Amino acid sequence: MENGKMNSLIAQYPLVKDLVALKETTWFNPGTTSLAEGLPYVGLTEQDVQDAHARLSRFAPYLAKAFPETAATGGIIESELVAIPAMQKRLEKEYQQPISGQLLLKKDSHLPISGSIKARGGIYEVLAHAEKLALEAGLLTLDADYSKLLSPEFKQFFSQYSIAVGSTGNLGLSIGIMSARIGFKVTVHMSADARAWKKAKLRSHGVTVVEYEQDYGVAVEEGRKAAQSDPNCFFIDDENSRTLFLGYSVAGQRLKAQFAQQGRIVDADNPLFVYLPCGVGGGPGGVAFGLKLAFGDHVHCFFAEPTHSPCMLLGVHTGLHDQISVQDIGIDNLTAADGLAVGRASGFVGRAMERLLDGFYTLSDQTMYDMLGWLAQEEGIRLEPSALAGMAGPQRVCASVSYQQMHGFNAEQLHNATHLVWATGGGMVPEEEMNQYLAKGR
């Protein structure tokens, strides 16, 4: 972006200056509305989410057999919700900032099959596509036992079709493993920052991995191009997919059930704050949408991004969405948080969700490494760097009197609050890689 344009952007949005300087930044969204007011802009409804629930239930018998690690939950891919009181104390001590309320962790990092939040959206979209093809071919009815999809006849049928996706890692892992298991031919277009072990794991499942020297945006574009030339190839579009988004949104109802099970209350007097790491936006956007449908105006969602890849904060704050990239303002999009290394946000998610998000913040790679180490020490939970992005949120909210006033929170409400950090990945990181992460924390 030339200097003149850049100066006028900064004049209009002074916060951009802090982003360019790679400062850890927090922006509380003044444009937040009620769910009733914001929902129509999403273009999806409660019914769409219920359809996704129903589809995952239909596939549960299949998943329980195809992936024995899901048998205990009857083929439902869901993660634990745990309190992390020792980490809460450690954060308070390290940052000299009390966190009022209780700190919880949602362990999507340990979801079965692919060990990340992408096991929600990625797997769901592959299943939805497989179902559509099998229904159209007359091989399946909605009331059938879907475990029959494991038969050689179905494998043979699906092998005529292929799937392509562009990814920095975790989405590729989910889609690759699931597609290969169903019988699709699958190609994952990986950006430069994808971890070697993720590529190796995909190849071990018979997935074709195409590597690029450039970033996420290029990998997605190349994947899209490759798929266009083949009528039997389905491209899963992380930047625009409503199906992926709905796969993530199912988490809202599921979390509500977990809260009920644990006797946790969410209402006007007991607000819920949720902190979601954000790359292109599909995962956190879908989850936040589901949470809003489940908890209404009593849940407050925040997106967390690396200082080197603040694409969603930049897009929503300036109102330019996918018309601007972090590279346009001179930021390099290089971060250890490989799952969040995205320079241009999803225009669909930004526009759909901007009224339903309370805020956005950035944090440095070093902050992620530090918190990764503390969590391992205090709670014995090991995550990958990007999964710690949400962990910086509670301090930011508890420290901001202006945010608390904007929403009219009193001391008692904050005392009764639940702070939920969404851990997005790390459950399958190899030991030696994890030790390298741990060595970088302070």
Curated annotation (Swiss-Prot):
The modification N6-(pyridoxal phosphate)lysine is found at residue 118. Coiled coil: none annotated. This is D-serine dehydratase. GO terms for biological process: D-serine catabolic process; isoleucine biosynthetic process. Monomer. It holds the Pfam family PALP. It comes from Shigella dysenteriae serotype 1 (strain Sd197). Its EC number is 4.3.1.18. Its cofactor is pyridoxal 5'-phosphate. The keyword Membrane does not apply. Keywords: Lyase, Pyridoxal phosphate. GO terms for molecular function: D-serine ammonia-lyase activity; hydro-lyase activity; pyridoxal phosphate binding. Belongs to the serine/threonine dehydratase family. DsdA subfamily. The keyword Lipid biosynthesis does not apply.
